């Protein structure tokens, strides 16, 4: 199975610019154009933070760009919720927030790790029980789980304060199942790692790129967009290629936060103390 994995599009329902700088719709168009010639795509997976303003119009813009792109290739478009997404508007345009997609002899399961009014992630007992029930029966070539907040620790200081709450609860459900891969976003930079032997793939952001080279008390983002091309063979480990969608403005500063700015956001949108 070949997957084009896109995340953190942060679209608007109007012509607003992200941080007053980034045209996120144009960035998504660049990403799709960069993937234009890839053969054999089976799925286009978007792993959350699809909208910035939570408007129905923003989700329609996303659907109207991605669905035809996927359809032209005989691929399936699959969408997951992120912390910026609005549950009702998402569901109205894109369908259920948690879902099982059968892809031939594979299966893709989307989860909703969003917490209303917050930026950290969480999966409640009911959702984990549902996932465990779905995974109780395996499929021939295994399952891919899509969840916005990665079940692995962040690299940058702000995102370490906005991680998935209790990732071990999710990993415990995945243990011993047929899950072969987890696709995530949220961190706005590419990351590939293993948790309990399961590959975790975090896609680059579309709206901007987190700078992982900053000092400990600095969070910085720059203009830059890309996606992950994920090949999941019938057996063995996935192969992940990271692809940039270049623009003339790549590398321009989007925002920079010092320690006070980081902790202000964490107090407002992080886990309750």
Where are the predicted features?
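Divalent metal-coordination and catalytic microenvironments
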Residues: 3, 8, 44, 49, ...
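His/acidic metal-ligating clusters that form di-metal
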Residues: 31-43, 120-201, 228, 238, ...
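Extended active-site neighborhood of metal-dependent phosphoesterases/phosphodiesterases
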Residues: 55-137, 169-175, 196, 216, ...
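Active-site-proximal beta-strand elements of phosphoester/diester hydrolases
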Residues: 1-13, 105-115, 144-147, 198-204, ...
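Acidic/histidine-rich helix-loop elements
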Residues: 7-27, 52-54, 86-92, 117-125, ...
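N-terminal active-site segment of His-dependent metallophosphoesterases
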Residues: 1-61
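His/Asp/Glu-enriched short active-site or ligand-binding loop at hydrolase and phosphoryl-transfer sites
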Residues: 203-213
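Catalytic metal-binding/acid-base residues of hydrolase active sites
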Residues: 10, 50-51, 84-85, 114, ...
